[in-house]
Amino acid sequence: MDLTKMGMIQLQNPNHPNALLHKANQMRLAGTLCDVVIMVDSQEFHAHRTVLACTSKMFEILFHRNSQHYTLDFLSPKTFQQILEYAYTATLQAKVEDLDDLLYAAEILEIEYLEEQCLKILETIQSSDENDTEVNMNDGGTEDDEERKGRHGRNLVGSKKHSTEESGYVSAAQQALALPGMVDQSPSVSTSFGLSTMSPTKAAVDSLMSIGQSLLQSTMHPGVGAEQPLHGNSHPMMGEIKTEMMQVDESGEHESPKAMESIASSNGERSGEPDKNRDGPGTPTRSSVITSARELHYVRDEGLGDQQAEVSQMGLEAMAGMTEKHLASLYGIPSNHKNEAMLSMPASMASSLHMSPALAMSMDFSAYGGLLPQSFIQREFFSKLGELAAGIKPDGRSLNERCNVCGAELPDNEAIEQHRKLHSGMKTYGCELCGKRFLDSLRLRMHLLSHSAGEKAIVCDQCGAQFQKEDALEAHRQIHTGSDMAIFCLLCGKRFQTQTALQQHMEVHAGVRSYICSECNRTFPSHTALKRHLRSHTAGDHPFECEFCGSCFRDESTLKGHKRIHTGEKPYECNGCGKKFSLKHQLETHYRVHTGEKPFECKLCHQRSRDYSAMIKHLRTHNGASPYQCTICLEYCPSLSAMQKHMKGHKPEDIPPDWRIEKTYLYLCYV
C-alpha cells in the first residue's frame, strides 16, 4: 500500500484533552510553572493564568494587568478551591448547601457552564419542593415547624441572566414593585441602569419610591391609618401581594393554591390580560430558580392584630420572596414571557430596610461598560444598602444614631458620618493611579479595572508614566517643562507650592537649625519640628508608652506608627495586586510598579529607576562613583552629610551665589 498517494493524513489523540488537564492539575498541585497567585481571605492559591483565563471570562479581563498577585473578596477559600478543581479537572464535589455560593461565584467569574449546571440542579430542587408543598396542602395536613422553616429557606427565589445571549438588566427594586396600572412593561422597555426620564421603567421606579415611603411611614407610625382598609386608594394591590409561604405561616392555616389563583385571576382582570396569558403548570422557567439554599426566618409580631401593620412590616420581604409565577399572575405578565433580566432584592436586606427607598436608586453603574457582570454590580449594590440599614431594629427604634436626611439608623457615629457622605456627594475614595475620586469603595474598585483593560498604554518619554489617552499625556508633560514644572525636593521627593517653601525645607537636609525653643533654647531645623517639640512642655514629656519595648512618645500617632514594627501591621494595601505595606510612602512607591513610572534618572547614563534607593545603588555601578559630586572641584562624596562637610572646606568667595546643595546630585527626579 503506497501511503504517498493517499494525500493528507489526520492524526488524532482522543485522550489529549483529559491528559492535558490532568498534567496541568499535577503541575498546579506541585507548584510547577505557576505564574499567578490568587489571595482569598489571606489564603494563597497558586495556579496558571492560562487555565484560569480559559475557564473564566472575568479572569481573562483581570489578567491584562500582567500582575502576579490578585485578591478576591467576594467568595470563601472553600468555594475558590472548588472553582479551581472544576477548572483543572472539569468536575467538582459539593454539598447541596454549597450550590448557592458556587452559583454566586460562577456568576461573577462568568464561568457559564458551571453556572448552567448549578441552575439545573436548583431548578430540580425547586420543582420537587413545590410538588411536596402542593401535596401537603391538598391533604390538609399540618406541617411541623422545622419543615415549614426549611421550606421558607428553599423558597427564597431570585432570577438573573442565564443565557449566553446579550440581554439587558433591570434592578430588583424596579421589577419587584412594578405594580399593574402603573406601567405597561414590555420586552422593548430599556432595562439598563442608565434610565431615561421618560421611560416606562423610570415611571415604575418613581412609583416604587412612593410605595416605599408609605411603607416607611406605616412602619415608623403603626398607629396612623389603622382604620384605613387594606385595599385603599393609594396602593390597591399591596394587600394582595402575599407569597405562598406567607399564607402558610399566617394563623397556622394552610391555603390551597386555588386561593392564590383567585388572587391572580382578579389581578389579571384588573390589568386587562386574557386567561391564556396567566401561568399554568409546567417546569420552572430559567428566571425562576432558587438562588439561596440558606434558611430564612421571618420575624412576626404576634401583638399586631391589624392586617395593615403586618403588610407594612413584611411588604418588602414578601416581594423579595415571590416566584416568577406569582409575579406573572399578579402583574398580568404572559406565562411565555421569560424576562431574563428579572432580579430579586435579597430578603435578608429587605427585612431590615426601614430607610427611604429613594436611596436605592442613587447609584448609577451604567458607566462601567461591561468591566464587571451586571449581576455582580447589583449584588454589591444591595450589599451596600444592607450595610446602610445595619443596626436598625424591626420595630424601627434606633440602636444609636439616625441620619437626619433619610432617617437611616446606624450603630455608631463613624457609620453615620460615612453614610451622610452619600447625601453630600463627598468623594472620599481616591484612585492612587490617576487621582480621580469616588463616593464609595465599590465604585473605586470597579474604576481600578479601567487601568488594566488591555489597551495599549502611551508612555511619557521623560519619566515613563503610562496613560490611556493622548490628552492625559499632554497634561502630564507640563510638569516637565516651563513655569508649571513641579517644585519638589530632589532628595526626598516631597512636593511644595512655592520655591520659598522648598528652600526652607532644604535647610532640614543641610543641617541648618534656625528655629529656637523659647522654653529650653533647643534649636530645630523647621517650624514643624519646633511645634512638635513644644508639646513636651505643655502635655507632659513622653506620655505615650509602647507596651512591647517600653519606648515613650510625645503623641499617640507616633506611637501607633512605632507599634507596627512589633506587630507587623501593614494597613496600606495596593488595590491592584493586594500587597500590603507598613508606611504610606512605601505604597506610593509600589504603585509605580503598576504604572511603569520611573521618575529617577541617572545624569551619567540616563538610566531610570522607580525609587531613590535604587538610583543610589545604580550610581555606585559607575566605577564606584558616589551619588554626590562637588560642582567646584568635581570631587565625589558617598553621602549628603559628607558633601555638606566637604563644602565647608571651600572658601565662601569660591561658591557661586546661586549654588544649592541639590546641584551636587548625580540624578534627576521628575515627581
Curated annotation (Swiss-Prot):
Gene Ontology molecular functions = DNA-binding transcription repressor activity, RNA polymerase II-specific; RNA polymerase II cis-regulatory region sequence-specific DNA binding; zinc ion binding
Got a GO cellular component term for this one?
A: cytoplasm
> Family assignment?
Belongs to the krueppel C2H2-type zinc-finger protein family.
**What ranges does the record list as Basic and acidic residues composition bias?**
270-279
Pfam family, any one? zf-met
Q: Where are the zinc fingers (C2H2-type)?
A: 401-423, 429-451, 458-480, 487-509, 515-537, 544-566, 572-594, 600-622, 628-650
Q: Which organism is it from?
A: Danio rerio
Q: What is the protein name given in its UniProt record? A: Zinc finger and BTB domain-containing protein 16-A
Give positions of region: Disordered: 130-167, 248-289
What are the GO BP annotations of this UniProt entry?
Answer: negative regulation of transcription by RNA polymerase II; positive regulation of type I interferon production; protein ubiquitination; regulation of cytokine production; regulation of immune system process; regulation of neurogenesis
Which coarse location class describes where this protein primarily resides?
Answer: nucleus
List, for all copies, the residue spans of the domain called BTB: 34-96
| Keyword flag Nucleus | yes
PROSITE patterns cross-referenced by the UniProt entry: BTB, ZINC_FINGER_C2H2_1, ZINC_FINGER_C2H2_2
Query: Keywords, A to Z?
Result: Cytoplasm, DNA-binding, Metal-binding, Nucleus, Phosphoprotein, Repeat, Transcription, Transcription regulation, Ubl conjugation, Ubl conjugation pathway, Zinc, Zinc-finger
* Subcellular location per the Swiss-Prot or TrEMBL entry: Nucleus; Cytoplasm
Q: Could you describe the subunit structure of this protein?
A: Interacts with btbd6a (via BTB domain).
Pathway named in the protein's UniProt entry:
Protein modification; protein ubiquitination
Share the record's PTM remark.
Polyubiquitinated, leading to its proteasomal degradation.
The record's account of tissue expression is: During early stages of primary neurogenesis, expressed in the neural epithelium, with highest levels in the forebrain and midbrain. Also expressed in a posterior-to-anterior gradient in the caudal neural plate at the 3-6 somite stage.
Q: What InterPro entries does this protein's entry cite?
A: BTB/POZ_dom, SKP1/BTB/POZ_sf, Znf_C2H2_sf, Znf_C2H2_type
Please explain the role this protein plays, according to its UniProt record. Probable transcription factor. Probable substrate-recognition component of an E3 ubiquitin-protein ligase complex which mediates the ubiquitination and subsequent proteasomal degradation of target proteins. Inhibits neurogenesis.
User: What gene makes this protein?
Assistant: zbtb16a
Q: Which residues are recorded as modified (Phosphothreonine)? A: T283
